[in-house]
Amino acid sequence: MILRGRTAVAELPAPPEAAISAIVAAELWAGAVKAKRASEAAALEQLLDFFPVLDFTVNVTRVYGEIRADLEQRGQPIGPLDQLIAAHARSLGATVVTVNAREFKRVKGLKVQAWK
């Protein structure tokens, strides 16, 4: 699984079943920095120490191109970072766990699990 968004770590599967995309890690860091609270950064560091962070590779770029072109052709775009996250997960055959399942479900061939 690739994790996106805030979750209770204790409720998630332990590694190696769960991992975080480097794209998600970047989004989480942006949120932690904007929060301007040391506790946010410390919590994020713990999360990133617990779960493996998966590198975004050139292999993922082809899948991204396929996803973006398909979504645009169907007139069902999703956010640009969500497209990258979807490409990363689909290239690995992974499941995206997200609070934004509705948007990710627009991506053909992507496994999505709603996180509440």
Question: For each predicted feature, which ranges?
Answer:
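Active-site neighborhoods of divalent-metal-dependent phosphate/nucleic-acid chemistry enzymes
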Residues: 52-99
